[in-house]
Amino acid sequence: MVSSLFINPFSEDAREIVRKYGSLDTIDDTRDELLEIGRRTRGQNLADNSLLPASIAELAVKRLEWYLRRQRKDFNHRDYAYLMNPEIEEYDVLAFYILAQAAGAGFMKASREARLVVESAGAMVEDRLNVFGGEREEIMAEVLYELGSEGLRWTELADLLGSGKLKLTDLILKEGRVIIDRDEFITSFQDSIRDRSPDRLYDILVGLEVRETMISRMIMQRTEEYIGMVREMSSTVEVHPLILETAERIRETVEEIMSFTGGPVKSARPGKLVQEAFPPCIRGTLDGVRSGNRNDAIVLLLTSFISYARLYPSVFRDRTPMKVSDLDPDLRITLGEILPVIYDAADRCEPPLFEDDPQEKLNITAKLGFGVHDMPELENEGESKWYTPMSCEKIKIHLPDLCRPDKLCSSISNPLTYYNRKRWKLRSSGEKEE
């Protein structure tokens, strides 16, 4: 049977491996056994030797590289098949901690790099659980026990729930306790269940997907906390140079894979707004909207349009999910260019939007993907979704006064499509350069 080490780097066995490991001076040393595991992994692409990690530090970076490439259209799972091989588990535990320490020592807790390391930990759990057959449920039960799910009260998950990584509606509760174990579910509810098998109902309500989500999110939360702890310690303790070197490799890897000079997001480079290319509905919104249409026009239409037009105009063509910080890592553009345009339009409304509805500033922040807060902050990103612009059809229904189509409108279905096409025409004719 595969051990929980392969899934849970926070188990006592995993911590023991870390405690017994020698000096950090050796994390960059070539490990023949690690290379051999990669070579004998079923399905591994062996055509390129650079695909296989030769050291623990290299394996650490490969974990992140796998996650970043996994989101691209050209991803080949055979390039990283060794990461799904349980034989790698002891090296992988060490690599996990090297990666997390490098993220904590080299970057702010709310940085893009730290966030990607946390997300990669959750994604790794999900993919690894999916490779198991009949052992999957047993391993999940063991990992949940290790993570402290037995007798867990939902209030103990406050940080996890507050982060948006887990929803209260995902959980089965009884008297404040989270019911996740099969036997506990049957014992707790069998007297209340009529005309159904308790086992079957458990599979429906607390199925593999719910347990997988809980494991993934709990490990993400602990990874985030560990990175934060390392960050605090790094201000008082000298960081090992190889950890800092790994942090630099993380930076280079993120920049290389998420750069906008190639790959599926080639056309996603942020560019200055070209107001001459705005469609009539957006121009009308910028001029100011009367009471009745103000909220939807500013919060739903303008916020998404301006943010995507400035940061990611090719979203519908690339179809690659992005967050604002992927394109604006320090939020300088968001705070300095995007929000002022939206707020100015809100002030031109009759009456000014925020005078009547100051809470709409919170909704604008939420529509950008930063949750219900006064202003976008990196630490809150992911609490909500970054919404794409409304379609022309929805604008006709919800904001008919703003829909005053011109000739170009007849051939498009979204204001952002209008913007891209008009911008291209302006560039082609030489009327406007970005």
UniProtKB/Swiss-Prot annotation:
GO terms of biological process kind: DNA replication, synthesis of primer
Residues involved in [4Fe-4S] cluster binding: 281, 392, 403, 409
GO molecular function terms listed in the Swiss-Prot or TrEMBL record: 4 iron, 4 sulfur cluster binding; DNA-directed RNA polymerase activity; metal ion binding
SUPFAM superfamilies for the chain: PriB N-terminal domain-like
Parts of the chain that traverse the membrane: none
Domain of life: Archaea
InterPro entries: DNA_primase_lsu_euk/arc, DNA_primase_lsu_PriL
Keyword vocabulary terms for this entry: 4Fe-4S, DNA replication, Iron, Iron-sulfur, Metal-binding, Primosome
Cofactor(s), names only, from the UniProt record: [4Fe-4S] cluster
Short name of any one Pfam family annotated for the protein: DNA_primase_lrg
GO CC annotation, single: primosome complex
Cofactor note: Binds 1 [4Fe-4S] cluster.
Family statement drawn from the similarity comment of this UniProt entry: Belongs to the eukaryotic-type primase large subunit family.
Subunit structure: Heterodimer of a small subunit (PriS) and a large subunit (PriL).
Record function comment: Regulatory subunit of DNA primase, an RNA polymerase that catalyzes the synthesis of short RNA molecules used as primers for DNA polymerase during DNA replication. Stabilizes and modulates the activity of the small subunit, increasing the rate of DNA synthesis, and conferring RNA synthesis capability. The DNA polymerase activity may enable DNA primase to also catalyze primer extension after primer synthesis. May also play a role in DNA repair.
UniProt protein name: DNA primase large subunit PriL
Organism whose genome encodes this protein: Methanothermobacter thermautotrophicus (strain ATCC 29096 / DSM 1053 / JCM 10044 / NBRC 100330 / Delta H) (Methanobacterium thermoautotrophicum)
Origin organism lineage: Archaea, Methanobacteriati, Methanobacteriota, Methanomada group, Methanobacteria
Name of the coding gene: priL
